[in-house]
Structure formats: C-alpha cells, structure tokens
C-alpha cells in the first residue's frame, strides 16, 4: 500500500469529487494521505476533509507565496488548528525565490514563526524550497530546529541534500522525479537513506509519467514510487512498504 505524504485536496476538489478521487486512490493501492494547507482557509478545509474521511490527515500553515497574509491573527488560527489530532504537520511553509511574489524578508519571518510552531506542537515541519533550498537550510541551522523536518518536492543540490540530512530531515520526492530530464532528482533519490525517504504527488500539480499533462491526484503516487524504485534499483513493493512506514512514523500515526 502507498502513502501520499503531500497533496492539496482543497484544489483537487474544484474539478473532481473527493469520493471519486479517493475511489481511484484505493484502486491504485493508496490508503492514506496528508492534505496540505497553504493558508488559513485551506488549512481549515483540510481539517474538515480529514474529519470526513478516515484515510486523510491534514496540515496547517501558510505557504511562502502567501506570507504577506501572515499576522498575529493568522498565527493564532493556525496554532488552534494544530491542536487537533487530525492535523499531523505544520506547513506548507518555507521559502520561494522562484515566483518572488513576496519579499524575502517577509517569507523568512513567517518561516521562522512556523519553525517555532512545529517545536511547540512537536509536529513535523513541511518545507517548500523552490530556488531557495540553501536559504531555508540556513534558517534551520541558525536555530534549534524542530525534531521532525520534511523537505517536500526535493529539488536541491547534492551538497544541500547532505546538509538537510545532517539536520535529520526526511526527503520527499514528487512526480517530477519521473521526468526524463530529472536525472539529478533520481541521483538524489539514490543518496537518501531508506529510513528518510518519502513520496508525494503534490496534487493537482506535477503529475508523474505516464500521467504527465493531466491533473495530478493521490492515486498517482504509485507512479512516483515506481520511479523511485527504478532509480534505487529496489523492488517496488519494498519502496511502498518503506515509504509508507516512514510517513506513518514521522506523522505519528499508528497505521
């Protein structure tokens, strides 16, 4: 069975019914997933979905591209969401220097607050690092980091990977690891210790081969797993077992 460690169900449900989405996921052997929030409203919706569907857990946080919305009020609302058992992670937070929607200092300030929330609630920090991996690692190295870190949709260099692993982080790979041009990601996947490896869809974005060009969904995480298995010269079933066990461990789930 597979575990999708990062999907945006609040976006997916704009185009498909969640019941259909979950049925296709089950058909593809996906039995658990984490619905990721990117601002207060989507974090609240992710919790609603998790309460309605036992196979879903959720996260709460504000994406760096929305960091201008971060305030004492939004932090208080995220803090309250994190008190719920169904909310198993803080984020998606981090830094995004690619789109540059938000001043870097504003992103960094919001990221630092999320770091403290993760420490306070003892929940893993889900980190977005588009064109900003080194800067995000620097922020974590400058403080006592949370004990559980997840670098989502890994895209960093080999040196950055070593630094992230030195922090004790888990590394999550998305559908782009299956792209023909992504040999650098497959190289990274080979270097990650088995007990730190996660997979995700980042639905509805980054659909893996052979679904590339379609809206992504949790059921496609098996294709991500197959790409990882091929890159690591491992059995697909072993990758499914390992990544599912890792996800359940870092999110604090019994099963």
Listing of model-derived features with the role each one plays in the protein:
Residues 1-255:
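Mid-domain alpha/beta scaffold segments of enzyme catalytic cores
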